Amino acid sequence: MTDTAMPGHGLLDGKVVVVTAAAGTGIGGAAARRCLEEGARVAISDQHHKRLAATRDELAAGHGDRVWSLGCDVTDEAQVAALVEGAAGHFGRIDVMINNAGLGGTASLLDMTDEQWDRVLDVTLTGTFRCTRAALRQMVAQGHGGAVVNNASVLGWRAQPGQAHYAAAKAGVMALTRCAALDVAAHRIRVNAVAPSLAVHPYLAKVTSEDLLAELASREPFGRAAEPWEVANVIVFLASDYAAYMTGEVVSVSSQHP
């Protein structure tokens, strides 16, 4: 299955969406594409500036000035603030924040270093916290509601060898999502998350052997990994008004749960 353009239904017409870790062909890039196809104006960000520029140019070729980009490392609070302020300044407001930035890796807890633990938690959990907080402050100041969609993982529910840091970070994203939802419900802001299982991603292919990827895919009832756009479709739903009564939810995008 390939990430091809899908017919838009105007689910996000007129909305301004910010997507982190949106460079390339992973879930973030697919989410940006789907939001554009659904009528949104989209600010994309990534810490990899060359890949970000290439993605921006590709998206702008089909969607013109509805695409804007700014490099951002989510471990840097000043860069996160600049992203939110820049997107709001460029498009006039922010309606949706999609927090996709995360970092994985494999290490037994017996061998895991403090640096490995800290790096994964800083990007995956604390980075999501920084971006969520900045977006919520902007949305509260605007006064017309909004939505945040975080990218968690089924590993926030399940145990897997060598994944203590990543699983802890994703479980934290789930808890952050639920608590943030209660903090801002009075402002008509919704906070939800998706929890994919195995999904196709260039980074995953770099850090995981082909044999292990094949084994993991074979465990899925569908016998394959999810395509990025299949996860992005659920993100778009949660960002849209179709999910207007959903908040604090973690939606499994998986063929098995939890």
Where are these regions (language model features)?
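Substrate-binding pocket helix/loop in short-chain dehydrogenase/reductase
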Residues: 108-109, 116-121, 204, 212, ...
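Residue(s) in the substrate-gating loop at a strand-loop-helix junction
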Residues: 153
